[in-house]
């Protein structure tokens, strides 16, 4: 039986490659971790491939090597290690050691030399060797025993592979490198000899440097460009060529106090890994480790308060339920959760309910489990009737995790319950505390704030097509899972609320904005929107016909048929066949066919990219809306019930899904037609109330700029007013083009647009765009002062705030990476405006909902999109409702300029604009 190969990993090479090739991940405090994660992923993959192999991860040691003594300029061109990479070296070394993998660093030589020595030693003992590297220098080591693998690309090089890739065998790789040199390592080589010339010389004379220099008289006859002048050039640089040979040669005789048989990996140090993964915020790996520790019955770092003894009840009889009902009535705060048949709250059926009243004391009441041999359960409606007074009592405080879902489930239950008194929601507590620090699901929060790995749904229900619904799960498994949900929710609230109370402005955002909004959003979701499925069917057919016509047009332009949805085929047509300029490449080095690239090509008047963009736009509308919306109609209500998400957008904005209303195009005819399919029922109208230029008004308020304040206070067309200032013309003489340019400047500056971006948008030279921006700031100095002030505050504090105290943390504001830092600065300027607009809309939604509930009017909010509320109103009440909601929306905040609300009415959503 053959021996398992020795696996040698070029750690230094992969560290650099991972840093430059992978996304720049950071922790919630801004600590870079992307390179660490990339290298660890690669190591774990290699260990799976070679489970029985001795293994060593080799890194360059600090300090000079023998090559620096040979040539003082060695690696002089290489820039110093970036700070964001330097800080990842120690955590990576610590993680490698904690994984039980042998790690080698030898002073005076490079990692290549250590790898070369171990590889040759192992090969001499007839053991195969696998070197994992992306470094071309290593090709010189390849022989019958030694193979190279590049884990990042999946490529493998044996002797034949080296010949195919480089044109010479492993025995000539050093000579090849010596002739052509290496700019990265500053190996000089022979000036004027590149890859093709070096290859021609070595193959032409049939040997390496020694043979070449003994055969200079044959060089002029070789079929190489400039061959006649090469002998003189080679002779002149003879010493440099042989120096380069020495520099490029990997040592294979380094004195190492290492025995190959001692390089077998040891057991991972679980506690050390848990501590490291916590620090690096590697959530999934940490979760797996904690779960393993729990299953193994280990404590130490893996121990959490929840792993201590808990008292979880599964309530199957009336006496047990009565006892828990008494506990709930006596508790100051109840954590609750529902278990159901579906993640769709509008279709889910209650399977059970769980509660916790103090840490470790929780219960699950199964109500509708259904499988062979299921124990007898309490009657669902009887239990819900008994819980109804408690759950509907607004004075009985409750905490949930994503409570909006439970509110809707209980409202739709066979015994409907109007859940009130939900004072806290751990998802929203985490979101308000720091919207970007972590995901806000319970599993992630438990891991982050409690150090606890929860029972996952997949653990009890399975995965994929065979996954059980909750009613099919055995009560013995369902009980601990459901009771833990309630217990963890209570513990999370205690941890998170303490942090929020320490920052009163954030506590107010939770209690005054986010929590009052929860029942409002739940009601909007239940209300749903009526859509005309027949009209959507007609639109779908029409879009399909237009797509067929665009396909034909694309085939004509390409001169052949191809799959318009295939980036590979499209790339071949655009770049190989039509010869369009390559503006950008993908991560794999292929010419990009991304939307932004096609848009740029279309701007250069290339026809095919224009057609492809039109085709893609229509394809997306068809698949996402005209085909999909009819499928999303709830069979019980006949309406579409979108889901609103409070804890997704970093700035505080709401987002939506199933369907995503935010992405319906506003300006295209096709997008407007989709809005026409959102209709009012007979006897009703749709009322759309929209904030006018809310972010610009907030900018005027924040910047305190007299010019902008004056324009809004006098109800001027702010874009026309800006155009008059920037272009130096009277207000009445502003042209349409000037107004459009001014609008681009107004909105562009909010989003941190550069002169380059503005020039592209309005079709002028960059210098001209910069002149417009300069004139803008000269006319509106308050805006420039606000931007500079905000950048400085963000850098000092690490966060920015809305008018209502919501924070957006910006860990990249101190990044050494200039692009990331600039992006954080742009976010710092925009986030207070976008976040304040979000806060105002949320406050308005609560005010409007309260008024509608108190008034008893036959009107309801059915949609919230961007800065707009859409209501369904009985026809004879339209004027009354319009007059009622306008002051509520405009009064949602007090600014230095008026908050203007524009309203429209129609039989469908498009008509209401």
Swiss-Prot record:
Species this chain originates from: Pseudomonas aeruginosa (strain ATCC 15692 / DSM 22644 / CIP 104116 / JCM 14847 / LMG 12228 / 1C / PRS 101 / PAO1)
Family affiliation: Belongs to the DNA polymerase type-A family.
Annotated function: In addition to polymerase activity, this DNA polymerase exhibits 3'-5' and 5'-3' exonuclease activity.
Catalyses which reaction(s): DNA(n) + a 2'-deoxyribonucleoside 5'-triphosphate = DNA(n+1) + diphosphate
Residue numbers spanned by region Polymerase: 505-913
Official protein name in the record: DNA polymerase I
Pfam families (alphabetical): 5_3_exonuc, 5_3_exonuc_N, DNA_pol_A, DNA_pol_A_exo1
Chain ranges of the 3'-5' exonuclease domain: 306-501
EC number: 2.7.7.7
GO biological process, one term: DNA-templated DNA replication
The entry's keywords: DNA damage, DNA repair, DNA replication, DNA-binding, DNA-directed DNA polymerase, Exonuclease, Hydrolase, Nuclease, Nucleotidyltransferase, Transferase
GO molecular function terms attached to this record: 3'-5' exonuclease activity; 5'-3' exonuclease activity; DNA binding; DNA-directed DNA polymerase activity
Name of the top EC class for this enzyme: transferase
NCBIfam families reported in the protein's UniProt record: pola, PRK05755.1
Statement: the UniProt record of this protein carries the keyword DNA damage: yes
Quaternary structure, from the entry: Single-chain monomer with multiple functions.
Domain 5'-3' exonuclease: 1-305
UniProt keyword annotation of ATP-binding present: no
Domain of life: Bacteria
Gene3D superfamilies per the UniProt record, alphabetical: 3.30.70.370, 5' to 3' exonuclease, C-terminal subdomain (1.10.150.20), 5'-nuclease (3.40.50.1010), Ribonuclease H-like superfamily/Ribonuclease H (3.30.420.10), Taq DNA Polymerase, Chain T, domain 4 (1.20.1060.10)
């Amino acid at each position: 039986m053959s021996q398992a190969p020795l696996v040698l990993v070029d750690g230094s090479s992969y560290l650099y490659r991972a840093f430059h090739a992978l996304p720049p991940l950071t922790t919630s405090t801004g600590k870079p971790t992307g390179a660490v994660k990339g290298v660890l992923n690669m190591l774990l993959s290699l260990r799976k491939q070679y489970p029985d192999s001795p293994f060593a991860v080799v890194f360059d040691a600090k300090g000079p090597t023998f090559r620096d003594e040979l040539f003082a300029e060695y690696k002089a061109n290489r820039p110093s290690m970036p700070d964001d990479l330097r800080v990842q070296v120690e955590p990576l070394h610590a993680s490698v050691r904690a994984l039980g993998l042998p790690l080698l660093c030898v002073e005076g030589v490079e990692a290549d030399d250590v790898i070369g020595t171990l590889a040759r030693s192992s090969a001499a003992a007839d053991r195969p060797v696998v070197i994992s590297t992306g470094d071309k220098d290593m090709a010189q080591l390849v022989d019958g025993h030694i193979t190279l693998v590049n884990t990042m690309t999946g490529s493998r090089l044996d002797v034949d592979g080296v010949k195919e890739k480089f044109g010479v065998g492993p025995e000539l790789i050093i000579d090849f490198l010596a002739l052509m040199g290496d700019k990265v390592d500053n190996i000089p080589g022979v000036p004027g000899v590149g890859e093709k010339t070096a290859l021609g010389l070595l193959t032409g004379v049939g040997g390496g440097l020694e043979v070449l220099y003994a055969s200079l008289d044959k060089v002029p006859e070789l079929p190489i460009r400039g061959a006649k002048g090469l002998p003189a050039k080679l002779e002149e640089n003879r010493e440099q060529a042989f120096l380069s040979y020495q520099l490029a040669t990997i040592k294979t005789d380094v004195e190492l106090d290492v025995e190959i048989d001692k390089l077998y990996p040891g057991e991972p140090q679980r506690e050390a890994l848990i501590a490291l993964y916590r620090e690096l915020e590697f959530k999934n790996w940490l979760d797996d480790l904690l779960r393993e520790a729990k299953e193994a019955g280990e404590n130490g770092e893996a121990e959490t308060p929840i792993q201590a003894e808990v008292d979880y009840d599964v309530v199957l009889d009336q006496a047990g339920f009565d006892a828990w009902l008494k506990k709930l009535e006596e508790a100051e705060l109840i954590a609750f959760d529902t278990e159901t048949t579906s993640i769709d709250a509008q279709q889910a059926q209650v399977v059970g309910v769980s509660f916790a009243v103090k840490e470790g004391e929780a219960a699950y009441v199964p109500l509708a489990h259904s499988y062979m041999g299921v124990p007898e359960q309490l009657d669902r409606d009887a239990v819900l009737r008994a819980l109804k007074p408690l759950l509907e009592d607004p004075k009985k405080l409750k905490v949930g995790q994503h409570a909006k879902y439970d509110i809707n489930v209980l409202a739709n239950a066979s015994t409907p319950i109007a859940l009130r008194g939900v004072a806290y929601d751990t998802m929203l507590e985490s979101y308000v505390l720091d919207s970007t620090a972590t995901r806000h699901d319970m599993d992630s929060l438990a891991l982050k704030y409690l150090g606890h790995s929860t029972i996952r749904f997949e653990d009890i229900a399975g995965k994929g097509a065979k996954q059980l619904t909750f009613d099919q799960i055995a009560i013995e498994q369902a009980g601990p899972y459901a009771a833990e949900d309630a217990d963890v929710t209570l513990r999370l609230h205690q941890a998170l609320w303490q942090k929020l109370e320490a920052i009163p402005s954030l506590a107010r955002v939770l209690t005054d904005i986010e929590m009052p909004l929860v029942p409002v959003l739940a009601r909007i979701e239940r209300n749903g929107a009526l859509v005309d499925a027949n009209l959507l069917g007609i639109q779908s057919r029409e879009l399909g016909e237009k797509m067929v016509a665009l396909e034909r047009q694309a085939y004509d332009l390409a001169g052949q048929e191809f799959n318009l949805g295939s980036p590979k085929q499209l790339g071949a047509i655009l770049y190989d066949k039509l010869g369009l300029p390559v503006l950008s490449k993908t991560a794999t080095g292929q010419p990009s066919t991304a939307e932004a690239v096609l848009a740029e090509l279309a701007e250069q008047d290339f026809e095919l990219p224009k057609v492809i963009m039109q085709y893609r736009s229509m394809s997306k509308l068809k698949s996402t809306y005209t085909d999909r919306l009819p499928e999303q109609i709830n069979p019980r209500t006949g309406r579409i019930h979108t889901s609103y998400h409070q804890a997704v957008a970093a700035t505080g904005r709401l987002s939506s899904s199933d369907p995503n209303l935010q992405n319906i195009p506003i300006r295209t005819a096709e997008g407007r037609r989709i809005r026409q399919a959102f209709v009012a029922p007979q006897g009703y109208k749709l009322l759309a109330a929209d904030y006018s230029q809310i972010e610009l008004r907030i900018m005027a308020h924040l910047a305190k700029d007299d010019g902008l304040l004056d324009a809004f206070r006098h109800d001027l067309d702010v874009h026309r007013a800006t155009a008059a200032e920037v272009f130096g013309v009277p207000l009445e003489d502003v042209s349409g083009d000037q107004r459009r340019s001014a609008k681009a400047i107004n909105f562009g500056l909010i989003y941190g647009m550069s002169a380059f971006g503005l020039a592209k948008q309005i079709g002028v030279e960059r210098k001209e765009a910069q002149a417009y921006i300069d004139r803008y700031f000269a006319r509106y100095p308050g805006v420039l002062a606000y931007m500079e002030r905000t950048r400085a505050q963000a850098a000092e504090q690490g966060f920015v705030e809305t008018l209502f105290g919501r924070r957006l943390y910006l860990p990249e504001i101190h990044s050494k990476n200039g692009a990331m830092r600039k992006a954080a600065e742009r976010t710092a300027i925009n986030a207070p405006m976008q976040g304040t607009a979000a806060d105002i809309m949320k406050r308005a939604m609560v005010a409007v909902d309260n008024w509608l509930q108190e008034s008893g009017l036959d009107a309801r909010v059915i949609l919230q999109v961007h800065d707009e509320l859409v209501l369904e109103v009985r026809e004879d009440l339209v004027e009354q409702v319009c007059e009622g909601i306008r002051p509520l929306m405009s009064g949602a905040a007090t600014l230095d300029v008026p908050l203007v609300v524009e309203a429209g009415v129609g039989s469908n959503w498009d008509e209401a604009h």
